[in-house]
């Protein structure tokens, strides 16, 4: 059985979130939360919140045991990009892309054996 949680349109670039997400893939949920608490990245609290939401979904909706949960899948997709302009020299302007992310966390019970 799997439980998942998704957060959409987070104002952090997907490239930066993937650095954090790669640290917890395949880990037990307790270990994953500990890793996120000690990771000094802006995306860490956001990923931790999604992970806790997935754990709560597993417990409430599917009555899974929290102690046996493992982060099965976690991935980051690109959300809509906010396009902004920065004034430059001689009356020109450069485009600034403010990227957003969709973060998905899937937890499942650890298989015995």
UniProtKB/Swiss-Prot annotation:
Q: Which SUPFAM superfamilies match?
A: Ribosomal protein L22
Pfam families for the chain: Ribosomal_L22
Which Gene3D superfamilies does the record cross-reference, listed alphabetically?
Ribosomal protein L22/L17 (3.90.470.10)
| One BP term from GO | translation
Keywords in alphabetical order: Ribonucleoprotein, Ribosomal protein, RNA-binding, rRNA-binding
Q: InterPro entries this protein is in?
A: Ribosomal_uL22 (IPR001063), Ribosomal_uL22_bac/chlpt-type (IPR005727), Ribosomal_uL22_bac/org-type (IPR047867), Ribosomal_uL22_CS (IPR018260), Ribosomal_uL22_sf (IPR036394)
| One MF term in the entry's GO annotations | rRNA binding
Q: Which PANTHER family match?
A: CHLOROPLAST 50S RIBOSOMAL PROTEIN L22-RELATED, LARGE RIBOSOMAL SUBUNIT PROTEIN UL22M
Subunit relationships: Part of the 50S ribosomal subunit.
Q: What function does the entry list?
A: This protein binds specifically to 23S rRNA; its binding is stimulated by other ribosomal proteins, e.g. L4, L17, and L20. It is important during the early stages of 50S assembly. It makes multiple contacts with different domains of the 23S rRNA in the assembled 50S subunit and ribosome. The globular domain of the protein is located near the polypeptide exit tunnel on the outside of the subunit, while an extended beta-hairpin is found that lines the wall of the exit tunnel in the center of the 70S ribosome.
Question: Hey, which family's this protein in?
Answer: Belongs to the universal ribosomal protein uL22 family.
Q: Specify the protein name.
A: Large ribosomal subunit protein uL22
